[in-house]
Amino acid sequence: MEFSMNATVEQLAPVEQQATAGWVVAALYQFKEVQDPADLQQRLLDLVKTINLCGTLIVAGEGINGTVAGDREAIDTIHQFLLNEGFNAMEYKESHSSDKPFRKMKIKLKKEIVTLGVEVKPRDLVGHYLDPKEWNELIARDDVILIDTRNDYEYKAGTFKGAIDPKTETFREFPEYVKKELEQHKDKKIAMFCTGGIRCEKSTSLLLQEGFKEVYHLKGGILKYLEETPPDESLWEGECFVFDGRTAVTHGVEEGANIKCHACGWPLTPEESALPSYEHGVSCLYCIDKTTEKQKAGFRMRQSQIAAAKRKRL
């Protein structure tokens, strides 16, 4: 079977309901040369058809990236498969979810495992890695520029104290932000962070490639920081947006209180979801004035169809 570089293969997770133990969620990535990405995609697809797994894995010539969820056996199976494929230096983190965090299992074939749109060499040139303790010491300094490399809606859910929001909607916009806003700071200490670490592999590589002198990033990203840092020692404020059914997590990588507006994708605090502007799957205070009544009617129809499908599965 042949796949184009933009092919997406979807496989419905074979088990709709999970055991009472809940779902193990594994976030992983590694930059590593993959000689035949399409072949790896197909073999992954063959594997996930046989186990109880949901989520997304992205395969490219530069490596693998993704988040998957399943029972303990399924997670161990996919983890061992990737180790056997030579991904033995993965940035790998586990957490848990009481509910199924993804609807489907997707194996995507792309040009990049995280899309920056600018050629960089994260296997050869990256910033200085810092563990949580070192990170706290660095970002407490006055001579450090702290940048959140994530998107605007992620920043909204929570960030590190004093972090700059580049106001990007996608990671592709980050190189333009660097060009416009950071060029004059090449001699400054730059500290960057993201959810799991992968975007900073590329963003720090980009800055070093552009001539920045001192570039640092949080090893393992926010998720590792929240896993290892006690709340009373933490410089994190709010919750960390995640791309699954949990919406956001907090210290200990426990599910947070934010929910997602399924009309616009923005995270909402309990106070925001209690406002009259919020209608599940239809609107929130951030998008209610950005859609027409016809669009809202379509969203309501979609929600009715989703609810009917759920009732049918019960």
From Swiss-Prot:
Keywords: Oxidoreductase, tRNA processing. It is an enzyme of class 1 (oxidoreductase). Disulfide bonds: none annotated. It comes from the Bacteria. One of its GO terms (biological process) is tRNA modification. One of its GO terms (molecular function) is oxidoreductase activity, acting on paired donors, with incorporation or reduction of molecular oxygen. Its EC number is 1.14.-.-. Residues 140-234 form the Rhodanese domain. InterPro entries: Rhodanese-like_dom (IPR001763), Rhodanese-like_dom_sf (IPR036873), TrhO (IPR020936), TRHO_N (IPR040503). Catalyzes oxygen-dependent 5-hydroxyuridine (ho5U) modification at position 34 in tRNAs. Belongs to the TrhO family. PANTHER family: RHODANESE-LIKE DOMAIN-CONTAINING PROTEIN 7-RELATED, THIOSULFATE SULFURTRANSFERASE/RHODANESE-LIKE DOMAIN-CONTAINING PROTEIN 2. This is tRNA uridine(34) hydroxylase. It comes from Acinetobacter baumannii (strain AYE). The gene is trhO.
